[in-house]
A protein has these predicted regions:
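GIY-YIG nuclease catalytic motif and its immediate N-terminal context
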Residues: 1-34, 40-53, 57-67, 72-82
Length: 82
């Protein structure tokens, strides 16, 4: 089972990704060299959105869709979930 997630970086920007283990991935973003290059220089990050998506293909498509959105549209998604 895959998850699409959005983290908010310390500078107020958002990073969107996919994973099978959200908790592990957030720890990697904050403490590991396995994190995305984008988040390594913007630590700490905090999870602001997570959604379960069926398989890797569907998760990748949803990740791509979210990454194309404006910051305002991403905020709408985050606020609707919370």
């Amino acid at each position: 089972m895959y998850h699409v997630y959005i983290v908010e970086c310390v500078d107020g920007t958002f990073y969107t990704g996919i994973t099978t283990d959200v908790e592990r991935r957030i720890l990697e973003h904050n403490y590991s060299f396995k994190s995305a290059k984008y988040t390594r220089s913007r630590r700490p990050v905090r999870l602001v959105y997570s959604a379960v998506v069926g398989d890797r293909s569907a998760a990748s498509k949803e990740e791509y869709r979210i990454k194309k959105l404006t910051k305002a549209k991403k905020l709408d998604i985050i606020n609707k979930k919370n």
